[in-house]
């Protein structure tokens, strides 16, 4: 597995096979790892991002105490034969970023977490623009997030296909 920390270094990503973007905030569990396994079964180049996104944390949610388990995450991704791990620097990734408004964010989970899905879609959009993956993987348990990502891909004419993995 190759670890990438700078945006400019994303150019080393193997483009001979389609790219599967698997965005995460780290603290990986079986569900995340099953998405990597699914991408490998489809013979895709797996690119996992680990970025604890400050934009999706509300005032009563503690960004500072979100679990950061990078060494364990790296080990688990190695075991799954992940191809690339992107660990972007917060300042570099968010520099000049345009904050987006997420549709469908005023009900279900979003009703109690104002701004959460705006932060999610802002950073996912940044990854899509930087990586231009053929596929983007999300877990089935995040239903509202799936709706928002699917809508964003469609409205912004991304050719990226959303793949929803089974809840593990």
Question: Where would I find each of the regions flagged by the language model?
Answer:
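Nucleotidyltransferase catalytic core that binds NTPs
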Residues: 1-168
């Amino acid at each position: 597995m190759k670890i990438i920390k700078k945006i400019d270094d994303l150019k080393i990503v193997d483009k001979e096979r389609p790219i599967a973007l698997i965005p995460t905030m780290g603290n990986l569990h079986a569900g995340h790892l099953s998405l990597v396994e699914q991408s490998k079964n489809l013979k895709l180049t797996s690119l996992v991002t680990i970025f604890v996104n400050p934009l999706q944390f509300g005032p009563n949610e503690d960004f500072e105490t979100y679990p950061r388990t990078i060494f364990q995450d790296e080990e688990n991704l190695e075991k799954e034969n992940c191809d690339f791990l992107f660990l972007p620097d917060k300042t570099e990734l968010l520099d000049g970023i345009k904050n987006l408004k997420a549709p469908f964010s005023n009900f279900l989970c979003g009703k109690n977490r104002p701004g959460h899905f705006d932060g999610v879609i802002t950073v996912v959009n940044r990854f899509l623009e930087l990586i231009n993956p053929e596929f983007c993987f999300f877990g089935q348990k995040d239903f509202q997030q799936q709706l928002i990502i699917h809508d964003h891909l469609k409205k912004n004419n991304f050719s990226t296909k959303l793949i929803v993995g089974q809840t593990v």
